[in-house]
Amino acid sequence: MKSRVRMIVVLVCVFVVLPVVGGLVYLSRISAEAAARYYAEAIAQGRFEDAIAVEGTDADADSGVGRGGAVDLRRGRVSEPSSVVSVRVYDARDVRGRQGASIDLSVNGRTITREIYLERVGVPRPHVGMWRVVSGAAQVEMVRAYGYASDVSVGGVSLGALGASGDGGATFPVAASTDGLWHAGSGGAVVYAYPGIYDVSVAKVSEHTQVAVDSVSGASTLSVLSGSREHQIDVTQDESTRAWHEEQLGSVASSCVLGDVPEGAVCSNMSVAGAERVDVEAPTRDSGDLLEVLVAAYRNDEGIDAFTAHSRVCFDEEGEAHIVVIRP
């Protein structure tokens, strides 16, 4: 009986204890360079959950990153994988005893360098052993957006809508009702992201709009690289709608002044009592989608009302364009 018990104990040691101990010994011997390389490979391949698992819960708390209320794109996905060019571990620890390393990633043909810091932990973990990343490769980026969209997402993570429907969404003072019309508006967010190329997805409110990312018309990706940390996503009227707006604004403004609102248009504070004739100069455009026109209304008492009218395009629920013109 004793021999059987002894044999069971031996078997347990051979098949259970020794592999566990051996595994712990192996993990404890993983170098900082190997841990940093695993972390870099996880980011390059878009395995962000694996990269996050290597980071401490307080990662970057002391590095000045200050994520705050930033949208966490580390929970998103890249449109295409990158590759690790090199991993270099510094010879000396910093004053806090942390091990520094520099990782180079090849992203869309460009080499991106990130400096990370690791520190030893008490319990070994898979792939990285006794190391964890306390200052990671993600950084804060500003993504600004403007236009017409019910949702804009980057890397599968929503940044919210651009504009809104109805009078509450108007970006200039409209006294008349715009119920059911979608106004352009601003949006975007501060994001916290690893280096990579991220898909930009836009839920358009109209097919008469076009998308530009970082001033590239028709682009559908956003690059988090080493350069500018500011990005711009625009969902604006397409060229044919812009041209239509400019061509039609003169006649729409004239009709509004005379009190004869064209079908589909919205006139706000435009009517001039006693107006018999209206002159409207060619419109001028600001840097965005706002058109301005100089209007002169000749009244039947020989008086003249001269003012500048403002106009924007809104879209209805079917995505059709409507001209909104106001007298501020």
Give, region by region, the residue ranges found by the protein language model.
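Core segments of small alpha/beta cavity-forming domains
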Residues: 25-74, 237-269
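Short solvent-exposed beta->alpha transition segments
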Residues: 48-110, 262-285
